[in-house]
């Protein structure tokens, strides 16, 4: 069976066929350690299972793998393997993962690369740990594994308000975000001149934190890391622009509908720009409602971690319909992270709530 990185496997099991291999690390940035008590059990499961990397696209640290298991991956061509690299500095990786066996990452990557196993990498960037010179070192090391290491994403650490007893971590500010983008740009220049690819991609959040414009789609080389929030906003904008070009001149209903767009604070200005363009073409009255994350803490600004409780408390009624992105709800359900459902939100806001794919054309269609 062959599949691209972003493709679903296409198989659905009636029940869990695998006993999930749990994580043996204690990463300084782990978001599960920052969850409040009392949520559903599945949200506290820390998986670090290479089988789920292939089946579901999950990222793994490789600290769970034995030599025999690595040989099996090579023998059966189980790929791509999505790897949480974070740093290639052995001592730093052991310290960040709190695992004395975590330092052999370069040797593991070399083994897979030498045997033709495709990989994608992820770096959760923590100020004062693996940023700046350490980031440059890590990216230089990972460049050496191209093309088997096909792409690398760099995402900022997420910090909730539930950090009592955990390692002290700082969030990125504008200056740190700009410095990170500069380092990534230097590596991209080298990779483009040598291989014609950017190879490493900053998450959307870094551009917004830095106050820089989002790049166009050519920056992302086909969006290999879009599931990590890398290029999602650019892809949305360009698909919306294309849909608006097709719809231009085809006016919507004579009676204006009022549609509310619910999002996180991070994307609020971006969604306002999109709403203004869509409203001008569709005739729909669009209002954007950015939700402050009181549940996890106001430093969590992405839409995927918004809870139903915060929506009900903050979003005013009055629209004919409300749109929420599908990354706010659990897969194949209407449940948000706090088990509040879209039906609960509909009752509170006295209007329909529509779950919309993170796609500009779907967004335009949903407001009809």
Describe the function of each predicted region.
Residues 1-148, 158-187:
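Conserved Radical SAM active-site core
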Residues 80-82, 118-120, 151-153, 199-201, ...:
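Structural preference for beta-strand elements that scaffold enzyme active sites
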Residues 84, 123, 153, 290, ...:
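Short loop/turn and capping residues at structural boundaries
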